[in-house]
Amino acid sequence: MRVPLTALVYTEGDTDRPVVSAVMKAAGWSGSEFEVFALGGAANLEKRLRQQVAQESPIPRIFIMDSDGKCPVELRRRLMAQGSAATVVLRICHYEIESWILADDQGFSRFFTIPLAKVVSPDGRNAKERMLRCVDRLGRSNTQDFARRTARNDGYGFGSRYTILLRRFVDDEWRAERAAPRSNSLSRALLRLRELHERFARAG
């Protein structure tokens, strides 16, 4: 029996995986058609991309990374050289994957019981910091599970159960299709991943 090919999806960190999985499914990929790997930072992701960018393979390899304030066009030009393999795809979250999370303001509002008008904008830099501050300012006893102030009290970091709560939020409330109209980079990613899936399905 022929074993179906599985797309390899690479992202920067473990906390990105729930969102990336949801985006893949929204683009038409079933859970058995892809696997998401966290590479431990942007430098490692770029290294893996350089190793594979020109290697032909029937297996789709999808790289999803943050722009972190850099110009996405210049970033793509630097990382995706001419002659890139047809099954290598780079999608850039502008500015961070947390921008995609915040783009579904309705889902975010419901999950965290925040007035819709108080959900911070997905646009602009430091989306992660702004998202965590938004939740921390609720002042509830369980907000530290998702967001916490740093030891120096000069910023915000992930809470002790951030990944668990993020996965629950993504499963219960977050919808890529609803977020896409408020995030151009997410909208383009969904379109490109749908096209890749159609090609992948035809090849199978």
Question: Can you annotate each of these PLM segments?
Answer:
Residues M1-T6, R17-E35, A43-I62, S67-G204:
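C-terminal accessory helical subdomains adjacent to catalytic cores in phosphodiester-
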Residues A38:
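Early extracytoplasmic/lumenal segment of secretory-pathway proteins
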Residues V9-E12:
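Short hydrophobic beta-strand that contains or immediately precedes a catalytic carboxylate
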